[in-house]
Amino acid sequence: MVYDCFCFFNELDLLEIRLNTLDKVVDKFILVESQLTHSGHPKPLHYANNKERFSKFSQRIIHIIVNDFPEFKNITHNKMSWIRENWQRNAIFRGIPKTAKDEDYIIISDLDEIPFRQKQLE
């Protein structure tokens, strides 16, 4: 199995490009979306609100919604932004099944860092 894992904000066109580019080499896409921006402001779930656009991939997308950020009273706003970003990225592991095997491939990258498909086929 090949798992392609990434955080998602609102880049719908880029998501479409990534899914189509990696369609033939990825078994499961793990898309992690937060209900907050890294600055802590509420945001809509753009993937959830546009799921029909990606219906071709619906059986292969594991959509993780992050809404359980830790709160710290004495942390600066800037540091909380980094904490939220890291928390969201670490939530990728919630989508990797416990049945994953040692021989499985897990790709973790930013949405715009699309692996070269030919390399995945090798």
Summary of predicted features, one role per range:
Residues D112-I114:
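Acidic metal-phosphate-binding loop of nucleotide-sugar-dependent transferases
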